[in-house]
């Protein structure tokens, strides 16, 4: 989450996590393009409007959706976890941009890590909580 300078452009970094997904997000002044793992964002997210809305939410909260290009490297999990990880990473990068951005992003919940993850399987059970059928006699 450091800001660095490359070729006279300032880059803002943020890392987001959700379930088993980890996203490293870079914000670069630009036109609002989203690139995920080298592919256009809408292609990577299968044109799913819910995923696209989640990725764009932090920028739209601050009214900066056309001001910054979003470059993402994401791995692990599925598209739902990856989209929410990108959302959190973008929000953290926007906090690096300006300290004033933190409060509206916090109110909208974009900075909060969602702790829900798959519960581990316990021995003696078929799944995390599903028990084998009980027979009284």
UniProtKB/Swiss-Prot annotation:
The keyword DNA damage does not apply. Residues 105-117 have a biased composition (Basic and acidic residues). It holds the Pfam family Ribosomal_S9. One of its GO terms (biological process) is translation. The keyword Metal-binding does not apply. Residues 105-137 are annotated as: Disordered. GO terms for cellular component: cytosolic small ribosomal subunit. InterPro entries: Ribosomal_Su5_D2-typ_SF, Ribosomal_uS9, Ribosomal_uS9_bac/plastid, Ribosomal_uS9_CS, Ribsml_uS5_D2-typ_fold_subgr. Residues 118-137 have a biased composition (Basic residues). PROSITE patterns: RIBOSOMAL_S9. Keywords: Ribonucleoprotein, Ribosomal protein. This is Small ribosomal subunit protein uS9. It comes from Prochlorococcus marinus (strain MIT 9211). The gene is rpsI.
């Amino acid at each position: 989450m450091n800001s660095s300078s490359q070729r006279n452009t300032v880059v803002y970094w943020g890392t987001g996590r959700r379930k088993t997904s980890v996203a490293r997000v870079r914000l670069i002044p630009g036109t609002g393009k989203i690139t995920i793992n080298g592919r256009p964002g809408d292609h990577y997210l299968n044109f799913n409007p819910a995923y696209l809305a989640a990725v764009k939410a932090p920028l739209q909260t601050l009214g900066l959706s056309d001001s910054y290009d979003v470059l993402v490297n994401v791995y692990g999990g599925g598209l739902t976890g990856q989209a929410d990880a990108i959302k959190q990473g973008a929000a953290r990068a926007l906090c690096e941009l300006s300290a004033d951005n933190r409060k509206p992003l916090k109110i909208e919940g974009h900075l909060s890590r969602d702790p829900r993850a798959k519960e581990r399987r316990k021995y003696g059970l078929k799944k995390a909580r599903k028990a084998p059928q009980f027979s009284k006699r």
